[in-house]
Amino acid sequence: MAVHVTRNQTQRGVLCRPADPRLDFLLDVDVSALKAAPKIGELLLVTPEEKVEDGLWRGTARVSLGLEEDAMVQERLTQLNHEIPLDFPPNVLAEAAELEKRAAEGAADLGGLKPLGSVEDALPIDRVSKASTSKRQDLRGVPFVTIDGEDARDFDDAVYVRRLPGAPDGAVWELWVAIADVSHFVLPGSRLDREARDRGNSYYFPTSVEPMLPEVLSNGLCSLRPDEDRLVMAARVGFDDRGIPRTSAFFPGVIRSRGRLTYEGVQEALDHGGELAGRHPYLKDAEALAHLLLERRQARGSLDFDLPEAQFIVNRSTGEVEGIKRRVRLFAHRLIEEFMLAANEAVARFLTAKGTPFPYRIHPAPDPDRLSTLFRTLASTDLAQSDLLTLKRGETPSPSRLRDILVQANGTPQEYLVGRLVLRSMMQARYSPEAGEHFGLASPCYCHFTSPIRRYADLLVHRALSFTLGATPGPILAGHKLLMAADQCNARERAATEAEREIARRLGCLLLRERTGETFTGVVSGVTEFGFFVEFDEMPVEGMVRLTTFRDDWFEYDPDRQELIGVGTGRRFRLGQAVTVRLTDVHIGRLEVNLELEGTTDTAKRSSSRRSAGGREAPGRSSGRKRNGFVPRHKRR
């Protein structure tokens, strides 16, 4: 157990409080095994031994983690709180090293390639799908590129788009998506496989990554690095001029990426041309197809939530949190998102049609009680007269209905309120061996295929696809075993999500602890019976104004309206309202940022200036990132 030292010089050593804010008791800790006496604010690993009385335990310190003001120490603490594995066992590393050795000696299976000199020489989709796929297609003539963040190290997807002359099947666009063939290296039942299953996914923090696979694989053999031959599982999907998929084919292959592009570089090329656009002229075709796919997805009702995404700036030498900013979402991000969504859907449709067991990614329709609360709350806003709010008894609104509500609120004072309420009505997306819709994407059939380096569910989908194509003999998981694997993936995804939220709160506390007494503007981001949360305009960090700080009034809580109403003064606080607050104190051990109200405005604050340029999985490239920082939401579908 990790604890904070809150007082030294007790009878046994020091008095501590658990660093996990869910635990509420004190420990009298023996620190005789430590090399030096711990300081107040230091974090220790402690073994609890016996309960002395209510709220007090005895324990013995095993090791000091460091001072709480160090961001890296806070990351380590968060990892402990959520049982996130760190170092790989020696036998797993040995197995990975053997794969690297075999690849270096040329033992990796790159033989028997079917020739494909250039993309123009590619077989028509219908012929590829009927051809034998037990051997790899040579796709090194296709000008694939990877597009990722500037600090990405593992590249698991590469793309290429081209326009087609009028094809008899109606396809006028051709999307190629090549995904690292992790299943070639990580075999079922191997030590690497068991370790990857236990981890479930990679875990990303502002200054570190705990990968699902050893770096020999994640950043080496499997990573689609430029100018190196890499094994892939490829998808080729043809679309008509409305963005409707008409054809698809899947096959194992080998590619040679033509470039390691960044989102920022691609956006510059799309906006202004230049040298990169000259080297990769098909980027404009990719942009056009992405717009087409986005428009079609929105037309069917897919939900997008434009929420702020934090990027912490940490000095890795000192551990100091130097700042925080909202990530800017570019169309280049959305371009990759649309292509990954299209590939995921195409694979899910194919495997479903073939009757192959695999883990679906499902997102159930919203809970009826949550929807009822949502519609009652919206009925108290300026949207009250909208026909969209007419809901028959027992009716579940379609994704397109909820999307229309979001669109109608765009640019109004209710935009923030409506966006938050719709998001809170959503269920949790999860993996399941049983087919089901993805409500947030308005997709009847969906899976995760595009990130097998960092999500175990994707690796299972790759094995199912390879088996169905006859490229591998199996076995693949089915029945109860597939259910157990899906449940494990769900559990580890939840751990990753909770850890992400916790480290954001911890680093937010570190950033604010030296700014007590300062005044901030913000917006009410949550309302409870004991106070309301405020998200700062300056940074995506929340604090709380407790009702106990008001000495001149008594407040009643209206859950339907998400509102607090002053009994004596009539003063109101509701979701989305603009306020000015003063930071009174910060308790990092309890993850508390305490505020007092300074002033309000009468209307809800518009959120368009507070948010990133796009949205994502209330739906989600789910859980997993490709860089040392927060995973972009477009990676989470």
Explain the meaning of each model-derived region.
Residues 62, 76-78, 191-196, 374-378, ...:
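Short secondary-structure boundary/capping segments
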Residues 139-146, 150-168, 286-300, 502-521, ...:
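Phosphate-interacting basic helix/loop segments used at nucleotide- and nucleic-acid interfaces
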Residues 1-174, 183-228, 260, 267-268, ...:
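Charge-lined substrate channels and their catalytic hotspots, especially those that engage the 3′ end
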Residues 23-29, 68-78, 82, 172, ...:
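Single-stranded RNA-binding regions, centering on S1/OB-family and related RNA-binding modules
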Residues 203-299:
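Conserved catalytic alpha/beta cores of large enzymes that bind or transform nucleotide phosphates
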Residues 263, 268-537, 544-546, 551, ...:
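Append "with occasional cross-activation on large, charged helical scaffolds in nucleic-acid assemblies
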Residues 166, 239-244, 314-318:
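Short acidic-glycine loop/turn motifs at beta-strand connectors
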